[in-house]
């Protein structure tokens, strides 16, 4: 009996132990990353040929402790390698693990290589050559602290390489992982298996080979034991011939009941070719189809739907994925009553979009990604969520967030008509109208932006996440916007200047119309878009007040108020902001509206410091400071409630005798210190209600706005 070690992906060890035991392995013992077992020659070859889960099967040669690279070299060079293979072979060393003495795997591999070739030289033999591409012999070294194990890799190439895959598409599953997913799915051999997003077909091919009793390595041409002196050719031929006979016998018995669907016809061609190479092309039916129109191909039977849909690291964007998973869940409940469903994904929250309760779940790794496989049992009662294909887009909302969907539909009907009359491209459709859906929905021309407000601490995070996913799904369905034109943002409570933090670097700008102006927006790169929609009427008012006046825009952001003032006939404009990014944006807004000339100044500065040093006066001032800021570029922190009187003192100094200050901020519960302003010689009238547009009338505390003049 030989002592062997089969490696596998973490999480599959127990599954592998069962498989090896069924293949005849003795004394199977699970450890992290694999299974130790004993086998005679026939069982050894059987596990190599038949294991669907093992990554490699190793025959340990040296097990020792080392405390330096010299110990490593001595252990290797002192071993009788001629008993394993002769000097004419090529070899390669895989080295895994490090410790204080062997800090790099390449160094460890080099010392093992040196020990082997030096051993052969001492025996009077020629040095065997190293081959990194296709060596005759592969040596596997594993170092854990001071414990060293050096093995002969009897697999050769890793066992997940079955030999049937020519081209995998964009996001392939390893064959060993696919086999484990099938084994854990609850699928029963002989029953239908459907993959509605099959990609290159790996899940179906692995399952079909299981049913057809095709050994996963039946078509492998090269093995790690080909040049091994202990190789038992007769035992190997017996095991392989048995596998060939079993596959041929089983082929005559099986009827096709594997079905693969995918939207991409190109990847389906790859799947068909892979299935042909795997010897199961006659068992699988392939069809180009959208999951949104998924049909059950075996209505009178019960089987399993298995799927590895796109997730964060694979294809697609978040809104598109939310919509995909949501409609997938609906089709399952309509078409596959009583069936088992098994879905593998790295995004557990996306699986929540299926709106199904998992009966079992398993953790696994897909490369570096932590993934989960969830199994479901579809109710035997047919879902009435979708009754007709033509009604698909409309009836979905009856299942997903119906209250939110109805409110959004109602708002769209009212606000869109108004916006068209006002010649507006950018406006708010929904603003936390329903407490359980704490988010905003804005339209920017052909785009929709969904902004999630941070949930209160007493709201369960998972529940809030589920509601967001439902709301995104409903928004896509109600608005009819394409998934690539829905932008999803998570908005936390603002701290300091983090509203200016960059989220992405796509650089995708387009302009929207607002009361005859054109303004650039960017929906993806920042938390905000470059245009505060709630201040639309404030900007319009500034344009109406600006004719013939010197205008100052303080805390200017992207300068949209400056554009209105300039087009309203301002004699001059001065735009001040601390951010160079937003000043450049403001400049582009001016250029877009054909506003040019030396009378339009853009100044990058700390607004408070600049104001203290300013020596000219203005007839119209717009100041819209942040609620709070502690930017490193500011000498002091800023709090609008605490510091607004100081700001007014400085603004009064630069305000002409008949001038007007339009002051606004977004602090909820802001209290203007009217007594202090009167002492400064200023009067303030709140005009918040006049600056609140129709699309924000549901949120009367979105901002407060004041008209301030000399007494």
From Swiss-Prot:
E.C. no: 2.1.1.173, 2.1.1.264
One example GO MF annotation: rRNA (guanine-N2-)-methyltransferase activity
Regions that span the bilayer: none
Catalytic activity field: guanosine(2445) in 23S rRNA + S-adenosyl-L-methionine = N(2)-methylguanosine(2445) in 23S rRNA + S-adenosyl-L-homocysteine + H(+); guanosine(2069) in 23S rRNA + S-adenosyl-L-methionine = N(2)-methylguanosine(2069) in 23S rRNA + S-adenosyl-L-homocysteine + H(+)
Cellular component GO terms held in the UniProt record: cytoplasm
Protein location: Cytoplasm
Sorted UniProt keywords: Cytoplasm, Methyltransferase, RNA-binding, rRNA processing, S-adenosyl-L-methionine, Transferase
Domain THUMP intervals: 43-154
Main location: cytoplasm
Matches recorded under CDD domains: AdoMet_MTases (cd02440), THUMP_AdoMetMT (cd11715)
HAMAP family: 23SrRNA_methyltr_KL
PANTHER family tied to this protein: RIBOSOMAL RNA LARGE SUBUNIT METHYLTRANSFERASE K/L, RIBOSOMAL RNA LARGE SUBUNIT METHYLTRANSFERASE K_L
Entry similarity comment: Belongs to the methyltransferase superfamily. RlmKL family.
Function of the protein: Specifically methylates the guanine in position 2445 (m2G2445) and the guanine in position 2069 (m7G2069) of 23S rRNA.
Protein name, per record: Ribosomal RNA large subunit methyltransferase K/L
Organism from which the protein derives: Haemophilus influenzae (strain ATCC 51907 / DSM 11121 / KW20 / Rd)
């Amino acid at each position: 009996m030989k002592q062997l070690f089969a490696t596998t992906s973490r999480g599959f060890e127990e599954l592998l132990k069962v498989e090896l035991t069924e293949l005849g392995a003795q004394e199977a013992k699970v450890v992290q990353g694999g299974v130790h077992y004993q086998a005679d020659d026939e069982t050894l070859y059987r596990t190599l040929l038949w294991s669907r889960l093992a990554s490699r099967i190793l025959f340990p040669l040296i097990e020792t402790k080392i405390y330096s690279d010299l110990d490593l070299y001595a252990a290797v060079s002192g071993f009788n390698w001629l008993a394993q293979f002769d000097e004419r072979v090529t070899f390669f060393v895989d080295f895994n693990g490090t410790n204080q003495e062997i800090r790099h795997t390449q160094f460890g591999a080099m010392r093992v290589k040196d020990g082997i070739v030096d051993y052969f030289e001492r025996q009077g033999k020629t040095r065997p050559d190293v081959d990194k591409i296709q060596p005759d012999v592969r040596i596997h070294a594993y170092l854990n602290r001071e414990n060293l194990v050096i093995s002969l890799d009897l697999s050769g190439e890793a066992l997940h390489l079955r030999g049937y895959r020519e081209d995998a598409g964009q996001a392939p599953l390893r064959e060993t992982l696919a086999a484990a997913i099938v084994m854990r799915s609850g699928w029963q051999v002989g029953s239908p298996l459907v993959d509605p997003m099959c990609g290159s077909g790996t899940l179906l091919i692995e399952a079909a080979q299981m049913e057809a009793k095709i050994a996963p390595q039946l078509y492998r041409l090269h093995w790690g034991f080909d040049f091994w002196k202990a190789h038992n050719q007769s035992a190997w031929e017996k095991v392989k011939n048995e596998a060939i006979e079993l596959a041929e016998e089983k082929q005559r018995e099986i009827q096709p009941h594997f079905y693969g669907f995918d939207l991409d016809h190109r990847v389906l061609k790859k799947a068909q070719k892979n299935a042909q190479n795997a010897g199961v092309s006659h068992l699988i039916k392939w069809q180009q189809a959208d999951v949104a129109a998924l049909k059950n191909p075996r209505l009178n039977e019960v089987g399993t739907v298995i799927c590895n849909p796109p997730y964060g690291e694979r294809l697609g964007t978040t809104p598109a994925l939310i919509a995909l998973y949501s409609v997938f869940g609906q089709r399952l409940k309509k078409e596959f009553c009583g069936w088992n469903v098994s879905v593998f994904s790295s995004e557990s929250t996306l699986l929540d979009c299926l709106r199904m309760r998992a009966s079992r779940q398993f953790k696994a790794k897909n490369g570096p990604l932590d993934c989960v496989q969830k199994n479901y049992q579809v109710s035997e009662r047919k879902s009435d969520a979708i009754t007709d294909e033509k009604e698909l887009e409309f009836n979905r909302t009856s299942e997903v967030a119906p209250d939110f969907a109805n409110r959004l539909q109602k708002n769209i009907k009212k606000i869109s008509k108004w916006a068209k009359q006002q010649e507006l491209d950018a406006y708010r459709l929904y603003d936390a109208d329903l407490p359980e859906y704490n988010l905003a929905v804005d339209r920017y021309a052909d785009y929709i932006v969904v902004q999630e407000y941070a949930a209160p601490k007493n709201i369960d995070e998972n529940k809030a996440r589920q509601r967001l996913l439902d709301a995104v799904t409903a928004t896509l369905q109600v608005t009819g916007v394409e998934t690539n034109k829905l932008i999803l943002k998570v908005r936390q409570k603002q701290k300091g200047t983090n509203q200016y933090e960059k989220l992405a670097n796509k650089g995708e700008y387009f302009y929207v119309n607002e009361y005859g102006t054109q303004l650039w927006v960017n929906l993806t790169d920042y938390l905000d878009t470059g245009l505060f929609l709630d201040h639309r009427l404030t900007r319009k008012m500034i344009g109406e007040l600006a004719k013939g006046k010197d205008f100052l825009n303080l805390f200017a952001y992207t300068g949209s108020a400056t554009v209105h003032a300039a087009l309203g006939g301002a004699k001059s404009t001065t735009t001040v902001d601390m951010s160079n990014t937003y000043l450049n944006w403001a400049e582009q807004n001016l250029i877009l509206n054909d506003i040019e000339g030396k009378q339009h100044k853009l100044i990058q500065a700390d607004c408070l410091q600049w104001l203290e040093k300013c020596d000219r006066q203005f007839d119209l001032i717009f100041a819209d400071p942040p609620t709070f800021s502690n930017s490193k570029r500011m000498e002091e922190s800023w709090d609008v409630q605490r510091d607004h009187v100081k700001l007014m003192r400085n603004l009064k100094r630069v305000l002409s005798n008949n001038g007007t200050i339009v002051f606004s901020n977004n602090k909820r519960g802001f209290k203007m210190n009217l007594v202090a302003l009167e002492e400064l010689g200023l009067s303030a009238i709140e005009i918040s209600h006049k600056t609140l547009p129709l699309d924000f009338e549901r949120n009367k505390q979105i901002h407060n706005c004041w008209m301030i003049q000399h007494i």
